[in-house]
């Protein structure tokens, strides 16, 4: 049963959950995420926290893109995750895996549409087949 309260998950909770590398925090993160998985708690993973997770996992821990995309996608599909931008974030993680482009550009590309084009000088958006307009 979902409660009215929606928890915003910070990067450090996701990292401790995925990496299981801290004697105190990892078990707490696992219990919280299990409650989200069981729909005992409602939570959202803000895009900014997802971006930071990708950056830390990729640059500091040297986790392969495929593992990053797979683990974060799986987390976003937990039954208690209630992000309004869930579809865009899942699409962004797929683009991140397939394109080799940074996650911020992938989120922008996944969120763009014919009626919400991206304005950028960055040529990576062509690779992502995003709706863009040049200045």
Features from the language model and the residues they span:
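Short beta-strand scaffold positions
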Residues: 9, 44-45, 83, 103, ...
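Short, conserved alpha-helical segments within structured domains
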Residues: 46-49, 88
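Active-site-proximal, substrate-binding regions of enzyme catalytic domains
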Residues: 54-78
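Short, well-structured N-terminal submotif of metal-dependent ribonuclease cores
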Residues: 1-45, 60-67, 128
């Amino acid at each position: 049963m979902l409660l009215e309260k929606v928890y915003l998950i910070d990067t450090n909770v996701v990292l401790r959950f995925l990496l299981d590398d801290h004697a105190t925090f990892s078990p707490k993160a696992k219990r919280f995420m299990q409650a989200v998985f069981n729909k005992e708690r409602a939570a959202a993973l803000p895009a900014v926290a997802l971006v930071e997770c990708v950056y830390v996992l990729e640059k500091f821990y040297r986790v392969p893109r495929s593992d990053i995309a797979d683990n974060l996608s799986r987390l976003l599909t937990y039954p208690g995750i209630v992000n309004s931008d869930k579809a865009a974030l899942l699409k962004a993680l797929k683009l991140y895996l397939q394109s080799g482009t940074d996650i911020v550009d992938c989120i922008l590309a996944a969120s763009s549409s014919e009626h919400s084009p991206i304005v950028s000088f960055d040529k990576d958006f062509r690779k992502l087949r995003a709706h863009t307009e040049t200045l």
